[in-house]
Amino acid sequence: QAAARQLQLPQPQIVVTQYAGQAREAARQYAASGTPVALYACGGDGTLNELVQGAAGSANVAVGCVPCGSGNDYVRNFGAAGQAPFLDFAAQLQAQPCRVDLLQTSLGIGIDICAAGLDAQVAYGIPKFRRLPGCGGTAAYTLSILQAMLSRFGHKLRVAIDGKENTGTYMMAAICNGGYYGGGYQAAPYAAMDDGLLDIVLVKPISRIQVAGILAKYKAGRHMQDADTIVPEFRSFMTLYRARSVEMQVLDNRPIIATIDGECAPVMELKAEVLPSALNVLLPRPACGSAVIRGLYECPMQAKAK
């Protein structure tokens, strides 16, 4: 409110949500009204996801994010400045909307990453660790990884990428519109949110010792040599595709855990496709990098891909 007064803008309305899904309902109501409005999610990726679901496809609603949750992976997609530009309310109120792609999945709509297998199993276990004192985003994620590594992982899957099928056993899959999940793990360091494509990372089963050995590199995005090349250490078990859609079917009668932007469920089938230019987002200018998103903003993810 102070930033709005300083900029001589109308005072924003502040709504404290009282139940899960309330932000989604509000965004849908604004979208249906046709009135131009900027909606800011003040929370974590779950709160943002509610606004995204409610505003998807609308021309009159723009969605911004003030990161104050435990993971805050969405804002990591926009450069080395990190959260700081998104916590600058003056910059937020002066942001102009630009269009980004979304993920349409059988679990719902999301903006960042849909995952299945070990990494989704990790996300499934995070809430109980977050209840522990001093156990925030990355710490809870790491503890959940350790728990998941002690369980059985790997599923026989039929995978169709843009209609081309293959069958194999996979430990995990990450279907990426953005690059980050799990409190800073960089699954797709060259993913761009406005290129009309998904970066799909498939990982075959490896030993628990191997998982422990590569985890830090995977978190830092060092499994990718460049936009199209996996580093030699990962090539025997990891494959990257860029596509518009992917379908997965479990063939071993054991449900696989899947997640979209942190929301988890056991499934026997998973479908995902890109929704090009499906959402107006608000990016504060200090969050910009060196390649243009729709001619308005700079995105370091695209700069890497050049």
What is the predicted function of each stretch?
Residues Q1-L39, N49, L87, C288, ...:
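ATP/NTP phosphate-donor binding region
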Residues T47-S58:
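Short Gly/Thr/Asp-enriched flexible loops that form oxyanion-binding sites at enzyme active sites
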Residues E50-V52, V75-R76, G184-Y185, A212:
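Short glycine-/acidic-enriched loop or helix-start segments at secondary-structure transitions
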Residues T17, G57-I175:
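Catalytic core of DAGKc-family lipid kinases
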Residues A115, D119, A174-P189, C264:
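Glycine-rich phosphate/pyrophosphate-binding beta-alpha loops
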Residues I161, T167, A192, L202-K306:
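ATP/nucleoside-binding phosphotransfer catalytic cores, i.e., glycine-rich phosphate-binding loops
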Residues A23, D45, A173:
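Short conserved active-site loop signatures built around small residues
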Residues R130-A140, G184, P189-A212:
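Gly/Ser/Thr-rich active-site loops/lids in small-molecule metabolic enzymes
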